């Protein structure tokens, strides 16, 4: 899934160390639970440098009141909502996340429940028990070779990932 575009990262995103940990919501598995927590900042997968297996958990996003500000702030033109592509049915679920732009290697990582995700940190969703075996497959050299054959550029899109063949049991 392609992730959210905030429209203005300077307003909506912070590094972890820039906010009070008391205002950060960790480990929530649903929008309702996050809303009920009263927290303002939530973990945000935004891509980042090449890293395989786990990591690049550097940012938090302002998702206070179920993202009310993000979901309702108009673009300066006044013609549309500034942020878009919220994927509300998928946020806070465990997933595999990958950086859209890469030097040459495909870096895919496991992400626990509780994260929202960015358009530069797109995510792959499946049954939670299957995520780690799928991670093993997608982080392999054969998967990288297939991805390079499908898309020889440095941009990895969700559609590229979805056509990698694997056993139905996964």
Describe the residue ranges of each PLM region.
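Polybasic, glycine- and aromatic-enriched phosphate-binding surface used to engage nucleic acids
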Residues: 1-169
């Amino acid at each position: 899934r392609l992730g959210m575009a905030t429209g203005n990262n300077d307003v909506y995103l912070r590094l972890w160390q820039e906010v009070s940990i008391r205002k950060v919501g960790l480990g929530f598995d649903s929008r309702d639970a996050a809303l009920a927590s009263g927290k303002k900042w939530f973990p945000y997968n935004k891509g980042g440098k090449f890293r395989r297996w786990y990591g690049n958990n550097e940012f938090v996003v302002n998702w206070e009141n179920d993202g009310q500000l993000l979901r309702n702030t108009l673009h300066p033109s006044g013609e549309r909502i500034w942020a878009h592509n919220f994927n509300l049915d998928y946020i806070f679920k465990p997933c595999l996340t990958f950086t859209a732009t890469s030097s040459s290697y495909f870096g895919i990582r496991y992400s626990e429940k509780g994260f929202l995700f960015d358009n530069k940190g797109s995510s792959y969703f499946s049954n939670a028990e299957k995520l780690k075996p799928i991670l093993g497959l997608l982080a392999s050299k054969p998967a990288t070779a297939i991805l390079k054959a499908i898309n020889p550029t440095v941009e990895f899109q969700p559609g590229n990932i979805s056509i990698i063949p694997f056993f139905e049991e996964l």
